[in-house]
From Swiss-Prot:
Taxonomic lineage of the native organism: Bacteria, Pseudomonadati, Campylobacterota, Epsilonproteobacteria, Campylobacterales
Family: Belongs to the universal ribosomal protein uL5 family.
A GO CC annotation given for this chain: ribonucleoprotein complex
Keywords: Ribonucleoprotein, Ribosomal protein, RNA-binding, rRNA-binding, tRNA-binding
Subunit comment: Part of the 50S ribosomal subunit; part of the 5S rRNA/L5/L18/L25 subcomplex. Contacts the 5S rRNA and the P site tRNA. Forms a bridge to the 30S subunit in the 70S ribosome.
A biological-process GO annotation: translation
Protein name, UniProt field: Large ribosomal subunit protein uL5
Species: Sulfurovum sp. (strain NBC37-1)
PANTHER family found in the cross-reference section: 60S RIBOSOMAL PROTEIN L11-RELATED (PTHR11994)
HAMAP family to which the protein is assigned, alphabetical: Ribosomal_uL5_B
Molecular functions (GO terms): rRNA binding; structural constituent of ribosome; tRNA binding
Any matching Pfam family: Ribosomal_L5
Function statement: This is one of the proteins that bind and probably mediate the attachment of the 5S RNA into the large ribosomal subunit, where it forms part of the central protuberance. In the 70S ribosome it contacts protein S13 of the 30S subunit (bridge B1b), connecting the 2 subunits; this bridge is implicated in subunit movement. Contacts the P site tRNA; the 5S rRNA and some of its associated proteins might help stabilize positioning of ribosome-bound tRNAs.
Amino acid sequence: MSRMKQKYNDIVPALREECGVQNTMQTPKLEKIVISVGAGEEGRDSKLIANMADTISLIAGQKAVIVNAKKSVAGFKAREGAPSGIRVTLRGDNMYNFFDKLVSIALPRVKDFRGTPRKGFDGRGNYNFGLQEQLMFPEVEFDNIIKTHGMNITIVTSTEDDKQAFTLLEKLGMPFAKGRN
């Protein structure tokens, strides 16, 4: 059992009490984590797309999928079927391992890091935030990167309430910024 899953099992009683949940099955929990990268201008360069997919696969510990555009949009210079991004969905042990790595290793390595913004909740219990570059993860070697890129991380929880999702993530060790940002 991963360290973060064990931590979740340890905080369940306190979490149930704080969220006012009677039924054990209503206890908030992590369902999945989605890591996505938009290709943007790099979408035309197949070498760069492959490098980005390899980097995200290394970070996630699971093979990333290249997402293609569904239809052409002239304003974005996007063609139907052209690569538009990379995505990987983590569940189970991979999800807990990635979350542990994110909270305990990657985020503390960010220069001038003051916490993730509190305003990333979507009103349905999910949390979104972005990272500026991928170099904070220990698996990524600077020499193997063609171009640095950011990523969007979506943490999906089983609750529909933002306050319960915030409590869950805070108890799991997510470093939120102080104040109301």
